[in-house]
Amino acid sequence: AGLGIDLDLGYTHHLGQVAYQGTITPYKVHTQSVRLALKANPIKEILLDYNVYYGRNYTSRFASHTEIDNLLSETAQIGVAFGKNIFWDIILEHNHVSSSSEKTDVLLLDSQLKWSGSRVEVGCELNNLLGMQAYHSIQRLSYATIQHSYRLRPRAVLVKVSFKL
C-alpha cells in the first residue's frame, strides 16, 4: 500500500512584438498553471493513477483586446491484478478547453484486459468505448490562432497475441 503526490505550480510572463498586416504589434502573454499527479496503491492488486493539469492564458495582442483561454486536462487510470497473470486497466480521459469564443469538452474511455503466461501473452483492448467521433480545439499563440481538428476511430476491439522467445 502506498500513496504518491506530485504538485507543480507555474507562472510565465512574456512580452514581444510581431509583424501584423505590415505593422509591428506588441503582445503579451501571462500563463498560470497547476499540475497534480496522484498515485495510490491501496492494496497490492489495485493501482489508482490520477493526473490533472489546469492552465489559464491571458493573451493581449492589441491595447484593448485580451483573450483568456482555459485548459483542463484529466486522466484517471485504474489497474487491477487478478492473481499473477491477469491484468485489467480502465483509462478515462477528459479535456476541457474554453475561451471567450468557444468551449470544447472531450471524454474518452478505453479498457484493456491482458493474460500473461510463461511463453505467450494474450490481450484484448477496447478503444473509444464512448463512441466519440470527432472534436476540435483552438490554441492561441502570441502571434497566431491554430485550430486543431481530430477524427477518432470508431469503437474498436483489438485482440493481440505475443509470443515470448
Task: Describe each PLM feature range.
Residues A1-L165:
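Exposed, low-structure sequence patches enriched in small/polar residues
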